[in-house]
Amino acid sequence: MKVFQYEFPDMLIKVSNNRKYLEDLCAGKVYMNESGYFRKLEDTYRGDKFDGKCVISFENHTGEFMELGPEESPEERIKIPLDFIQNFTVGFKGDNKIPLYCCSQLSEHILRKETEFSLKFKEEFISEMEQFGSYYAIFSKVEFLQNMLDYIDDNQLGGKWGAVSYVDIHSEYHIEILNDENRNQYNVFFKKDLSYQWQNEWRIILVSSGAPLIGENDHHFVASIKPLSWFHIGHIRELRDNSIEIKEVDDSEVDGNVLRQ
């Protein structure tokens, strides 16, 4: 991964109020929230009522009707006058019970150059993270993802992962998306409104072809993966007080002290 002109290891940051939660993560216990969790927090700073949903916009729709149905079967298509429709939100059955794990991704977006050979976290990112807790863990994205993929394979699950794109969520989706039978219904979990951009999020979700992984009366799922071989846990004030030093290393060298005073 390139950060400014430097080759940098892919790193993830997880913030929590519970240090034990972060210790469990590094030991291989990944507590995944149900995907509807943040919709329940819509009245708090952390909440997002549109997380995992399509907000259908009619702002740029020029026709008088909304047409729904398969294009190859015109007789099955229906027309609905737009006079009777306002913007609405679309999801799918069970879209609130998918195991989801989110972190922040180390990138240029949340870093600034302090000197030629040191970087600092931007204040916007730190302020955002302070809303989520007092402790953080930093660890290798490559190792974490590989351990999660091993878990997915061992348990015959499906999954999707990647960085979140930040968009104007109220104009991102148009009515035509409902007629796209080839769209991946899970893509919506990887787009969030621009107002959340300082979270700089990276996510992974798990999908089962059988029974739901999170039952109706449950609220989280625990994925038991191999322990992480490299990580650092600290107080979030370190992100503000300390710098990331850049130095040349041999391919075989691993520097565990990412943050230095």
Protein language model regions, located:
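NAD-dependent ADP-ribosyltransferases
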Residues: 1-261
